């Protein structure tokens, strides 16, 4: 999972991820937007579920984050569309709408994101 942190002309932090993990970047850009308190909340929840059978979920406007003891899933809320609504033979391109990664890798990304924001 490759990624980079950037700043646009206004100083807003943007995150780009490699193919297969793009949704994590979209989630950070759309749902977190540099909110360190939200990062604190997610990291605390990760510490609670780590090594357990428990799960935790954070619903956002566009994306939902799920954590369990080993894995993280970021999923676009638009994927809640029922299969009945699809025309026969059609399926969704969801590579940029769904991502799974390990909890430790995800926490490293959040730490890098936090460090980049603080390092203005």
UniProtKB/Swiss-Prot annotation:
Superkingdom of origin: Bacteria
Protein name: UPF0231 protein YE0706
One Pfam family linked to the record: UPF0231
InterPro entries found in the cross-reference section: UPF0231 (IPR008249)
NCBIfam families: PRK05248.1-1, PRK05248.1-3
Family: Belongs to the UPF0231 family.
């Amino acid at each position: 999972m490759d990624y980079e942190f950037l700043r646009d002309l206004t100083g807003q932090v943007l995150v780009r991820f490699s193919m297969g993990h793009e949704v994590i970047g979209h989630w950070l850009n759309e749902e977190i937007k540099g909110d360190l308190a939200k990062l604190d909340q997610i990291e605390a929840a990760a510490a609670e579920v780590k090594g357990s059978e428990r799960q935790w979920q954070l619903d956002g406007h566009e994306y939902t984050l799920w954590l369990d003891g080993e894995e993280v899933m970021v999923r676009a809320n638009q994927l809640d569309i029922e299969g009945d609504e699809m025309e026969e033979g059609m399926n969704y391109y969801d590579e940029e709408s769904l991502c799974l990664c390990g909890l430790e890798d995800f926490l490293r990304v959040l730490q890098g994101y936090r460090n980049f924001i603080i390092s203005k």
